[in-house]
Amino acid sequence: VPWPGCCSVKAEIHILRNIDVYFLTLASLCLVLSVSLGLGMGFAQDFSLSHLHSHLNLVGWVSMALFGLTYRAYPALAEGRLAKAHFLLSAPSGIMFPAGIYLLITYGQPIPAVAAAIVWLAGATLFCVMLVRLAFAKGLA
């Protein structure tokens, strides 16, 4: 055990309670990166990374922020292992997908982008399933 309590149930519950904050923090970092990239492209008048810029905005900033806000609006969504699985699928792939697009644009390597996109799709699908389950549980569907 690297540090006391790292793998305890209490630590896992703590992560799930703050999943909204983790998604919102990650989203804000993506926003800053995307705006910086956009400014750099504008200053240089080189828009060859525009696909990276748009994916960093939509996958990183918008989607992650919407995940975070949804978890904040519906705290019951963060209960259970599906929320943790969703975070573990979406957070890394939300960063790796735009990074893979960078590798595709600059080096012609499509595999990282494709792999990250598939993991991102799995996370998005899981989130959709979680929302539908919550809607049925609350009698909204």
Question: What residues fall within each predicted segment?
Answer:
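Hydrophobic alpha-helical transmembrane segments of multi-pass integral membrane proteins
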Residues: 2-141
